[in-house]
Amino acid sequence: MDRYVLRPNDPHLWAMYKKAVASFWTVEEVDLSTDVRHWTDKLTEAERRFMSHILAFFAMADGIVGDNLVCNFAKELDHIPEARAFYGFQVAIENIHAEMYTQLIITLVAKENQAALFSAAEDMPCVKAKAQWAAQWLNATHKPIATRLLAFAAVEGVMFSGSFAAIFWLKKRSLMPGLAFSNELISRDEGLHCDFACMLFRQMANKPCQDDAHQIISDAVDIETAFFREALKTPLLGMNSDSMKLYIQFVADRLLDALGYAKMYNVSNPFDFMDNISIEGKTNFFERRVSEYQRMGVFTPSSMEFTMNEEF
């Protein structure tokens, strides 16, 4: 019965949970009124097509991540109090992300086109490939937990990264402020989720060998690259499938390094507008207050004591 008592053992994992709580936000705090006009009057048809692909993927992606947490990780790791707390909160945050993407589609996309985006996981091949890869790991409960933790770090750390960058590209051009703001909040959340996965992974036994880890990351990179070849059939000013491929490889190397493996691609970041934004949380992106959404008092000193005696 002791596992029902929330008594943290690892101050670093617990700090991740407290950071997540401090970053809570809601869909109602995002103003999309200007975005409606920008979507119609300022984005080109090619840009709307590109963003529609991204929204179609995101509309279902958080549901798969949430299912994995509820069905697998939260149960398998419930002996670790920090993981139990973090994953419980992450499920709520993934629901907010899913709600946000639904609201974006309903608000921005013409009504006759919305159904196609909501069913993209079945009907849009490049989105379906991403969904199937993530679902494959959702159902791979015969695989070691460390291997699946790595795979879902790839989902959130690689398969989300290009789409986040695409929306930051709009922000650089002062377009779609509501979408850009929600993207800042969501990418911050997902970066924290990925950081937590990496921290937990490094403490686990029975990690996959480097060849297996490289294969998982390589598969994620290939599927993500194929997605952008389809989404970016028409090159855009400052955004094309070749530069996106380099960015995805760059992010994959950062993730491999955070997980404790050798890099695979050794490429530079092709997007100057992403230089100060690390999806893996390597900069102070999570330390600063993002538009004053960090809840006051969450990081105040606590009387709770920590011990470093947990076995992983």
From Swiss-Prot:
<dbReference type="InterPro" id="IPR012348">
    <property type="entry name" value="RNR-like"/>
</dbReference>
<protein>
    <recommendedName>
        <fullName>Ribonucleoside-diphosphate reductase small chain</fullName>
        <ecNumber>1.17.4.1</ecNumber>
    </recommendedName>
</protein>
<feature type="binding site">
    <location>
        <position position="193"/>
    </location>
    <ligand>
        <name>Fe cation 2</name>
    </ligand>
</feature>
<feature type="binding site">
    <location>
        <position position="97"/>
    </location>
    <ligand>
        <name>Fe cation 1</name>
    </ligand>
</feature>
<dbReference type="InterPro" id="IPR000358">
    <property type="entry name" value="RNR_small_fam"/>
</dbReference>
<dbReference type="Pfam" id="PF00268">
    <property type="entry name" value="Ribonuc_red_sm"/>
</dbReference>
<dbReference type="GO" id="GO:0046872">
    <property type="term" value="F:metal ion binding"/>
</dbReference>
<dbReference type="GO" id="GO:0004748">
    <property type="term" value="F:ribonucleoside-diphosphate reductase activity, thioredoxin disulfide as acceptor"/>
</dbReference>
<feature type="binding site">
    <location>
        <position position="94"/>
    </location>
    <ligand>
        <name>Fe cation 2</name>
    </ligand>
</feature>
<keyword id="KW-0479">Metal-binding</keyword>
<dbReference type="InterPro" id="IPR033909">
    <property type="entry name" value="RNR_small"/>
</dbReference>
<dbReference type="InterPro" id="IPR009078">
    <property type="entry name" value="Ferritin-like_SF"/>
</dbReference>
<comment type="subunit">
    <text>Heterodimer of a large and a small chain.</text>
</comment>
<keyword id="KW-0408">Iron</keyword>
<dbReference type="GO" id="GO:0009263">
    <property type="term" value="P:deoxyribonucleotide biosynthetic process"/>
</dbReference>
<feature type="binding site">
    <location>
        <position position="94"/>
    </location>
    <ligand>
        <name>Fe cation 1</name>
    </ligand>
</feature>
<feature type="binding site">
    <location>
        <position position="62"/>
    </location>
    <ligand>
        <name>Fe cation 1</name>
    </ligand>
</feature>
<keyword id="KW-0215">Deoxyribonucleotide synthesis</keyword>
<comment type="similarity">
    <text>Belongs to the ribonucleoside diphosphate reductase small chain family.</text>
</comment>
<feature type="binding site">
    <location>
        <position position="156"/>
    </location>
    <ligand>
        <name>Fe cation 2</name>
    </ligand>
</feature>
<dbReference type="InterPro" id="IPR030475">
    <property type="entry name" value="RNR_small_AS"/>
</dbReference>
<keyword id="KW-0560">Oxidoreductase</keyword>
<feature type="binding site">
    <location>
        <position position="190"/>
    </location>
    <ligand>
        <name>Fe cation 2</name>
    </ligand>
</feature>
<feature type="active site">
    <location>
        <position position="101"/>
    </location>
</feature>
<comment type="function">
    <text>Ribonucleoside-diphosphate reductase holoenzyme provides the precursors necessary for viral DNA synthesis. Allows virus growth in non-dividing cells. Catalyzes the biosynthesis of deoxyribonucleotides from the corresponding ribonucleotides.</text>
</comment>
